[in-house]
Amino acid sequence: MKKILMIATGGTIASKETENGLTPAMTGEELAASVPGIKDKCEITVMQLMNIDSTNMRPRLWQLMSDTIIEHYNDYDGFVILHGTDTMAYTAAALSYLIQDSPKPIVLTGSQKPMGNPYTDAKINLYQSILYALDDHSCDVTVVFNGKAIAGTRARKQRTRSFAAFESMNFPVLALIHDDKILRYFRDREPSMDDLKTYHNLNDRVFVLKLTPEVKADIFHLLSSHYDAIILETFGIGGIPEYDDSFEKAIFDWVNSGKTLAVTTQVPEEGCDMEVYKVGKKYSEHPGILQAGDMTTESIVAKLMWILGQTNDQKEIRKMFYQTICLLYTSDAAD
């Protein structure tokens, strides 16, 4: 019988009603006991790593999760992390970079309604996550939610209330799960233990700046003492304003100082390409300015934190950013 380590971190799935609103209160053991049948399928060990609202998730807690999985990697056949939905996509992306090419599945799941709610989606999500983690063809980091298995670098929370909370952005779902069956769309890549690569260091000095009409160029100066990289969410396919030269100067001052700028789009689907319009093309050749293609913002945040945790050399940052960490899960961007 396979062994699964279930890591509980809190979130809606573990929450109970209080006078101050929903608050994580159920333990991992209580959550596991709430889903009949899962302990008949495998040996489950529950670890209560934390019990927080995922709004309070931080990079240091990603490191704690990653280090915990690595410490117990040889003792289990798979890992299931119970996590709040609000920052699950960030955590899934971060773990994808901290634990690369894992031959063992690392599955994140949660719910839109607490386990104790009579209409909860928690039981089916946890049950299907265990099923997916037990399957011989499962590997790497995935989000399993509402019958879908989504690559860790492609998940995004798209809905705040409905059970279909997560979508796979700019890449197909890896599998559908229904009636105890897994319908896979990808079967050709199964890494071995020799492929496994693990990391610890992260640099959390990464900021997401969303462009709005008339945004002030001074923002770069204000951020310079606190951050090493900015992710610029541009207009459309990669448009950066040029109503005067202040914004252009601020961007080049930023990257010429050795800092990093990654360009993405505010539009959820189909990605960015700065070379299409004049308002973006002038920035495309600088080694400190990176194009994120169709990566999610959550994945860009995690990837830059991981890269900057390994190096501060601008050329090496560029090389690592465009290096694909998982060939299966990419379309035109180097996840």
Name each region found by the language model:
Residues 108-178:
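Internal gly/pro-rich beta-alpha loop/helix module
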Residues 68, 245-258:
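Catalytic-core regions built around general acid/base machinery
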Residues 329-335:
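Conserved small/polar residues in nucleotide/adenosyl-binding loops
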Residues 7-8, 34-35, 151-237, 242-243:
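Accessory alpha-helical/coil subdomains and C-terminal extensions
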Residues 277-285, 290-305:
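Interaction/scaffold regions that mediate signaling and macromolecular assembly across diverse proteins
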Residues 1-71, 249, 269:
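ATP/NTP phosphate-donor binding region
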Residues 94-121, 134-136, 255-265:
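Short, acidic/small-residue loops that bind anionic groups at enzyme active sites
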Residues 82-104, 242-249:
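Short Gly/Thr/Asp-enriched flexible loops that form oxyanion-binding sites at enzyme active sites
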